[in-house]
UniProtKB/Swiss-Prot annotation:
Keyword Zinc: no
GO MF annotation: an example: acyltransferase activity
Biotechnology comment: MELs not only have high potential as eco-friendly biosurfactants due to their excellent surface activity, but also have attracted considerable recent interest because of thei runique properties, including self-assembly, anti-tumor and cell differentiation induction activities, and moisturizing and hair-repairing properties.
Chief location of this protein within or outside the cell: other
Knockout consequences: Abolishes completely the production of mannosylerythritol lipids (MELs).
Name of the protein: Acyl-CoA-dependent acyltransferase MAC2
Organism (species): Mycosarcoma maydis (Corn smut fungus)
Any one GO cellular component localisation term in the record: peroxisome
Keywords of the record: Acyltransferase, Peroxisome, Transferase
Cellular compartments annotated: Peroxisome
InterPro entries, per the entry: CAT-like_dom_sf
EC number: 2.-.-.-
EC class (word): transferase
Functional pathway: Secondary metabolite biosynthesis
């Protein structure tokens, strides 16, 4: 069976391995050869009655306990082959057998930051540096004694085997901090290292292997058992995507060459400018609810109207395109979709066997659909709404079959081979790494959007478990409440990624890019356009208007 080919297998008594498939493989090659491209950071502030001393005392053991529940945080995706060549084609998990190995893993994975650094500063640092050593999938920081702000936990993870699941990992760590068994253990033995020695049991690979994350392709084959016709249908979608990318398109222009002294940076570390930007716009919970209501009445979704606003702003502000001769450019939409639409159980955040569930989507908006006969690219609000409906219809048409997943394996194999071949040749030629990333990217970046949906999670944690309750005014016992939260990304190539996510009732639109390659002021303006148009659209809908059928 196809699914069995990609399953986890015990290759030695304490080592499990499986092939990386599709987008996983593509991301692993990009991360390795493109200086940590696509790596993620997610942060939560903690409101708690635990002292700093207790947080620090419990943190490492809490993360160790989470590994027992979610062994994915111990996976690796860079290894070596028998001839010592680098292996980027497999994920591995090594079951820890000694308490010394366990303590080493804790020391390298659960890091306490207590030098005054704030959570916001630390996320800037994590997004501006690649995770070391290469292939490590997960590291988590506890920020205490910050110059300002409450304590915080920040996960810095590879995107290869992570996505929505990071929220579940964070919540599980928070729960572990107030777990009654951990509290009792440290009351009896206050030294965390001694406490670990008193409870350590070697990991049982046979027990853990069933909890390790499977590939999206494995889940797809198990669920749908595709026929030859189904697989052909998937490759037709791939052909459509390639055809769309060849059509003349608007986009965000990169600079003429990588900036050696970027105008916009977030400071320097060890003499190196921090130029990985995460420009963010946040819509609060009250306004977000109004937006959702308005869009339901208009018969559009929030992601589709945001995408329309991004596309229109790029069309108005950026005069660059890939058109030749007398061609009029449309818009090639390069976006990611989540496979939960086809595999809801397999990709469910808190019990998901599939952690990387991204599918590459595509659509092309023609010049006539993109612009108004009356207003050109200066669309009215009604015309923006029509553009949003057009984008939604095209996305629905492209994503009308789960068999698109079948083509992702070929995409992963071909793109990863291309990434490796190009990077190796450039390294052999002595090309500057930033110049290499610049040269490997298109002259313009087509309109992108990755919409991650609304991520809801319990925010109050006590020894009794997690709940949806608000932070208590007076607590009967220990608690940790998840306050402000945000996510960040690392985009190292010459592309601009717009990411949309709902967190705790708020809506956040973030743009990830490197200011060595793009004008940060231009991208700020695009974000401002989106926010302004969103608000104008919401105000055009009467309060008593009925909902439209989507």
């Amino acid at each position: 069976m196809q699914a069995d080919k990609h399953a986890w297998k015990e290759v030695s008594p304490n080592l499990a391995q499986r092939p990386l498939v599709g987008v996983e493989k593509l991301l692993n090659y990009a991360e390795y050869y493109q200086n940590g491209n696509f790596q993620l950071s997610a942060a939560i502030h903690l409101e708690t009655n635990l002292t700093t001393e207790k947080l620090q005392q419990r943190f490492g053991l809490a993360v160790w306990n989470v590994r027992c529940l979610l062994p994915e945080i111990g996976t690796w995706t860079v290894g070596t082959t028998g001839d010592a060549a680098v292996d980027l084609d497999n994920a591995t998990f090594t079951a820890i057998q000694t308490v010394e190995e366990a303590q080493k893993w804790i020391d390298e994975t659960a890091v306490i930051v207590q030098d005054g650094t704030t959570a916001e500063e630390l996320t800037i640092l994590t997004t501006n540096h690649t995770i070391e050593p290469a292939g490590k999938q997960f590291r988590v920081y506890l920020v205490t004694n910050a110059r300002q702000g409450s304590p915080a936990i920040i996960v810095n993870a590879s995107h290869v085997l992570s996505g929505h699941r990071i929220a579940a990992q964070l919540c599980t760590i928070v729960q572990a901090l107030v777990d009654a068994r951990l509290v009792s253990l440290l009351q009896a033995e206050p030294d965390p290292r001694a406490a670990l020695r008193s409870i350590f049991v070697p990991e049982n690979l046979a027990r853990l292997i069933g909890k390790l994350p499977i590939s999206l392709n494995t889940a797809y084959h198990k669920r749908f058992n595709p026929t030859e016709g189904d697989l052909e249908n998937g490759f037709e979608k791939l052909s459509e995507r390639l055809a769309n990318s060849a059509l003349p398109s608007i986009g965000i222009p990169r600079l003429s060459s990588p900036a050696t002294n970027p105008e916009y940076s977030l400071g320097t570390v060890n003499g190196e400018a921090m130029t990985i930007m995460n420009l963010r716009r946040t819509i609060g919970s009250n306004e977000y609810r109004l937006l959702i209501d308005a869009h339901k009445k208009l018969g559009i979704t929030v992601p589709s109207v945001i995408y329309a606003c991004i596309v229109n702003s790029i069309d108005r502000r950026c005069k660059s395109n890939t058109a030749q001769d007398a061609e009029t450019p449309g818009a090639n939409l390069a976006y990611s979709a989540h496979a939960k639409r086809w595999l809801p159980d397999e990709t469910f955040m808190t019990r998901s066997p599939v952690n990387m569930a991204i599918v590459l989507g595509s659509a092309y908006v023609s010049p006539d659909e993109l612009r108004s006969k009356q207003h050109g690219c200066d669309l009215s609000i009604d015309e923006l709404i029509e553009l949003a409906k057009t984008i939604r219809a095209k996305q629905d048409a492209y994503l009308d079959t789960p068999h698109i997943i079948s083509a992702m394996e070929q995409v992963g194999d071909e793109v990863s081979a291309m990434i490796a071949d190009t990077a190796i040749k450039q390294r052999q030629a002595g090309t500057d790494p930033h110049v290499a990333l610049f040269e490997n990217s298109p002259a313009i970046c087509p309109p992108t959007l990755t919409s991650q949906g609304d991520i809801a999670f319990k925010r109050l944690y006590t020894a009794q478990g997690g709940s949806w309750d608000p932070e208590p005014a007076v607590a009967a016992g220990e608690y940790v409440y998840i306050g402000h939260s945000w996510n960040s990304g690392r985009t190292t190539d010459a592309s601009v990624c717009f990411a949309l996510v709902g967190f705790s009732g708020e809506l956040r639109l973030t743009s990830y890019f490197d200011s060595r390659f793009f004008d940060a002021k231009l991208i700020e303006s695009i974000l401002d356009d989106v926010l302004s148009n969103l608000r104008m659209i919401a105000t055009t809908v009467p309060v008593d208007a009925p909902e439209a059928k989507l």
